[in-house]
Swiss-Prot record:
It catalyses: H2O2 + AH2 = A + 2 H2O; 2 H2O2 = O2 + 2 H2O. GO terms for cellular component: cytosol. This is Catalase-peroxidase. Gene3D superfamilies: 1.10.520.10, Peroxidase, domain 2. Belongs to the peroxidase family. Peroxidase/catalase subfamily. Its EC number is 1.11.1.21. Bifunctional enzyme with both catalase and broad-spectrum peroxidase activity. The keyword Metal-binding applies. The gene is katG. One of its GO terms (biological process) is hydrogen peroxide catabolic process. Heme b binds at residue 262.
C-alpha cells in the first residue's frame, strides 16, 4: 500500500520529477528531429486529404463570415475602434514572419503559432486572443480549413475589409499537431536577451549567426525600441536590412511591409506590464491556454498591454491609406516613453485633426506614435528614398505592399503547383521558382536503352540523380529535381556537385533529351533509377525502380541565382562529403539534411548503406565503402559495420581505420558519418536489421522506396 498523499502514478517525462532518457547524456546525438516525421500525433488519420477537403469549402461563405467577425466586437477582448483588423493582421504577419531563407524553416505553412515556443514568444503576446476569436469559424468549417490557412486568410481579409486591393491568396497549408523540434531559434537562455552575452546570436561587428533572422530570442524581426532596446534609428535600419534580407525581402519590400503593417491597428502599452500573467505555456490550467492575462486591472481595450508601446501609427487606423507616410515624413518626432515604459516617438506640434481617436471613445483624440524601426525608414538614406516615393504615389505603394504581403505569406508554400483556390494569382513570380510543364508522352523504354548505351557508369547516373534531388527542402518546399536546375547557375558550379563530372554527364543527357523528346529533369532521374536497377541485378535482385514522368526544365531566366545560393549543400553525409570543417559534427549535419529532405531515421539509414556500396562518395572517396563488391546493391555496409571482428581506430578529426582484430591490418576507412550508424543505439538498431541474413531483400526494397521518395519529393501534382 502507498502512504497517504504520495503520488499514485509513475512520473513521466512531462513532469518536473523526471528528465527525458537522453538528458543524462546531453552530448549524445539527438534523433528527435527525425522522429517528428511520425504520424502518430496527427488525429486525422493516414487517409485524410486536406486537398480533398478544400474542394468542399465554400470560399465565399467563409470570407463573408470572416468579414462579419472582424466587426463583431466581443466583451472579453473588445476590438479597437470596433474592428479586429489590426489584431488579425499582426497574427498573420507574425505567423509568416518567422520564415528564414537559410534553411526554409519557420513561416506560416504549418500553423505552428499554436504551439510552443512560438505561441509564448513575447512578440506574440495576445495573439492567443486572435486565434480564440477565430475559433467559431474554425469550428464551423472544420476540416475544410486548416489553422495555418485560416490565420493567413484572416490577415488578408482584414486588409481587404479596410480598403486594400490584395494580390491574391492560396489555400493549401497543412497543420502540424505538435511543436517543431528541428527549428533552431537561438541559444539564448532568456527571452529578449541582449547581444554580447553568453549564447549571443551575434559575433564580431554585429554579425548575426546563421540561420537566424530575428535579432532577439522571442522576437519576429527587429526590436521596435532599438538595438538591444536602445533607440538609434540608423542602427535599427542596419538590423532591419539584415533581418528582412534573411526573410527574402529587399529594401523596397522592407519599407512596404513595415509601413503597410503599421498603416492599420495600434500598439498596446497603456498600463503596467508587471500586471500581466505568464505566457500560454506557463499559464495556470484554468486559463485554458490563454496567456498574458491581467487580473489586477481592467487590461482590455484602451487599457490593454501587449508590446508595451502605446498608440496608433496613423490618423485612421482602420482604413488603408497613405496616412503612415503623411505623419512620418511631415512631422518631426521626439523620443519619449509609453505608459508601460517602452521607448517610442511622438510628433512635435501635431495638428489635432491628425491625431487618431481613442479606441473606445471617438470624442477623444490620442497622440500617434512611431517605433525606432519606423523612424529608421525616415533616417536611413535608402529607406528614405523609397518612403518618399511611396508617399507621393499611393497606388504604387499599395501595389508594392500587396505583392510583398503575398510573398511574405506564401514564401514557404513552395511552387505554384501547391496553390489552391479561386484567388490564386495567374502571374508567375520568380521567387516561386517557376517550372514549365514537362512532356509526358515519350517512349520510356527507348530512353532507357539510350541511357544504358551511353557509356555512363552506374555511379555517374546515381550520383547525378541524387545531387539533383537532394536540394529539396520540406521546410519551404524549394529545390529538388524538377526543373533540372542542376544544369543552371548557380547549381552547376557548386563544389558539392563536382562541376566537371556533372558537365560530362549532362552533355550525354541533353543529347538523349533532344533525340527522345524527354526533359532533362526526367532523364536525370531515369538514369539514376537505371543505375540502381543494374546494381540490384548484380546482387541477384531483378527489380524495377518506380518512375514518375512529367518533370519540366527551367531556364536561367526563371532562376534567381542569389535566391538559390542558400540551397547549396555545404555537407552531404549521404555522399560522405564536407565542404570544409565545421563546428557542428558531420553526423549532426547529416541529421539536418535528412530532416530537411523529409526523411525518417530508418530511411536515412538504408539510404546511407546503399549509397556507400554503390560507390557514390564525393570524388570517388573509399571512406565508408565497406564492401568487396562496389557497385552492387547489397547490405555489405551493415554486415561489416556490425562485425565484431573489426576495431575502429581514429586517424584524424574525421577519419578512422577499420582494423582486423587478429591481424591489425587495415581493412577499410571511414568517417564519423559512417561510424555513427554503429555507435548510436537507435541507428545501430536499424543497422542490425539490415545486416541480418534474412533481410537482404528487405534492404533492397527499402532502399528503393526511400530513393523514390527523394526523387519524387518535389512532384506536388
Amino acid at each position: 500500500m502507498t502512504s497517504k498523499g504520495m503520488c499514485p502514478v509513475a512520473h513521466g517525462a512531462n513532469t518536473e520529477a523526471s528528465e527525458t532518457p537522453m538528458a543524462w547524456w546531453p552530448k549524445a546525438l539527438n534523433l528527435d528531429i527525425l522522429h517528428q516525421q511520425d504520424t502518430k500525433t496527427n488525429p486525422m488519420g493516414s487517409s485524410f486529404s486536406y486537398r480533398d477537403e478544400l474542394k468542399k469549402l465554400d470560399v465565399g461563405a467563409l470570407k463573408k463570415d470572416m468579414k462579419d467577425l472582424l466587426t463583431n466586437s466581443q466583451d472579453w477582448w473588445p476590438a479597437d475602434w470596433g474592428h479586429y483588423g489590426g489584431l488579425m493582421i499582426r497574427m498573420a504577419w507574425h505567423s509568416a514572419g518567422s520564415y528564414r531563407i537559410a534553411d526554409g524553416r519557420g513561416g506560416a505553412g504549418t500553423g505552428n503559432q499554436r504551439f510552443a515556443p512560438i505561441n509564448s514568444w513575447p512578440d506574440n503576446a495576445n495573439l492567443d486572443k486572435a486565434r480564440r476569436l477565430l475559433w467559431p469559424i474554425k469550428k464551423k468549417y472544420g476540416n475544410k480549413i486548416s489553422w495555418a490557412d485560416l490565420m493567413i486568410l484572416a490577415g488578408t481579409i482584414a486588409y481587404e475589409s479596410m480598403g486594400l486591393k490584395t494580390f491574391g491568396f492560396s489555400f493549401g497549408r497543412e497543420d502540424i499537431w505538435h511543436p517543431e523540434k528541428d527549428i533552431y531559434w537561438g541559444s539564448e537562455k532568456e527571452w529578449l536577451q541582449k547581444s554580447g552575452g553568453k549564447g549571443s546570436r551575434y559575433s564580431g561587428e554585429r554579425e548575426l549567426s546563421n540561420p537566424l533572422a530575428a535579432v532577439m530570442m522571442g522576437l519576429i524581426y527587429v526590436n521596435p525600441e532599438g538595438v538591444d532596446g536602445k533607440p538609434d534609428p540608423l542602427k535599427t535600419a542596419q538590423d532591419m536590412r539584415v533581418t528582412f534580407a534573411r526573410m527574402a525581402m529587399n529594401d523596397e519590400e522592407t519599407v512596404a511591409l513595415t509601413a503597410g503593417g503599421h498603416t492599420v491597428g495600434k500598439a498596446h502599452g497603456n498600463g503596467n506590464a508587471a500586471n500581466l500573467g505568464p505566457a500560454p505555456e506557463a499559464a495556470p490550467i484554468d486559463e485554458q491556454g490563454l496567456g498574458w492575462m491581467n487580473h489586477k486591472t481592467r487590461g482590455i481595450g484602451r487599457d490593454a498591454v501587449t508590446s508595451g508601446l502605446e498608440g496608433a501609427w496613423t490618423t485612421h487606423p482602420t482604413q488603408w491609406d497613405n496616412g503612415y507616410f503623411n505623419l512620418l515624413l511631415n512631422y518631426d518626432w521626439k523620443l519619449t516613453e509609453s505608459p508601460a515604459g517602452a521607448h517610442q516617438y511622438e510628433p512635435i506640434n501635431i495638428k489635432e485633426e491628425d491625431k487618431p481617436v481613442d479606441v473606445e471613445d471617438a470624442s477623444i483624440r490620442c497622440m500617434p506614435m512611431m517605433t525606432d524601426a519606423d523612424i529608421a525608414l525616415k533616417m536611413d538614406p535608402e529607406y528614405r528614398k523609397i518612403s518618399e516615393r511611396f508617399s507621393k504615389d499611393q497606388a504604387y505603394f499599395s501595389e508594392t505592399f500587396a505583392k510583398a504581403w503575398f510573398k511574405l505569406t506564401h514564401r514557404d508554400m513552395g511552387p505554384k503547383a501547391r496553390y489552391f483556390g479561386p484567388d490564386v494569382p495567374k502571374e508567375e513570380l520568380i521567387w516561386q521558382d517557376p517550372i514549365p510543364s514537362g512532356p509526358k508522352s515519350y517512349d520510356i523504354d527507348a530512353v532507357k536503352a539510350k541511357i544504358k548505351a551511353s557509356g555512363l557508369s552506374m555511379s555517374d547516373m546515381v550520383t547525378t540523380a541524387w545531387d539533383s534531388a537532394r536540394t529539396f527542402r520540406g521546410s519551404d518546399k524549394r529545390g529538388g529535381a524538377n526543373g533540372a536546375r542542376i544544369r543552371l547557375a548557380p547549381q552547376k558550379d557548386w563544389m558539392g556537385n563536382e562541376p566537371e563530372r556533372l558537365a560530362r554527364v549532362l552533355a550525354v543527357y541533353e543529347k538523349i533529351g533532344k533525340e527522345c523528346g524527354i526533359s532533362i529533369a526526367d532523364t536525370i532521374i531515369l538514369g539514376g533509377n537505371i543505375g540502381i536497377e543494374q546494381a540490384a541485378k548484380a546482387g541477384g535482385f531483378d527489380v524495377k525502380v518506380p518512375f514518375t514522368s512529367g518533370r519540366g526544365d527551367a531556364i536561367q531566366a526563371m532562376t534567381d541565382v542569389e535566391s538559390f545560393e542558400v540551397l547549396e549543400p555545404l555537407a552531404d553525409g549521404f555522399r560522405n562529403w564536407l565542404k570544409e570543417s565545421y563546428v557542428v559534427t558531420p553526423e549532426e549535419l547529416l541529421l539536418d539534411r535528412t530532416q530537411l529532405m523529409g526523411l525518417t531515421a530508418q530511411e536515412m539509414t538504408v539510404l546511407i548503406g546503399g549509397m556507400r556500396v554503390l560507390g557514390t562518395n564525393y570524388g570517388g572517396s573509399k571512406q565508408g565503402v565497406f564492401t568487396e563488391k562496389e557497385g552492387v546493391l547489397s547490405n555489405d555496409f551493415f554486415v561489416n559495420l556490425t562485425d565484431m571482428n573489426y576495431l575502429w581506430k581514429p586517424t584524424g578529426q574525421n577519419s578512422y581505420d577499420i582494423v582486423e582484430r587478429n591481424t591489425e591490418k587495415t581493412k577499410w576507412t571511414a568517417t564519423r558519418a559512417d561510424l555513427v550508424f554503429g555507435s548510436n543505439s537507435i541507428l545501430r538498431a536499424y543497422a542490425e536489421v539490415y545486416a541480418q541474413d534474412d533481410n537482404k531483400e528487405k534492404f533492397v526494397n527499402d532502399f528503393i522506396a526511400a530513393w523514390t521518395k527523394v526523387m519524387n519529393a518535389d512532384l506536388f501534382n
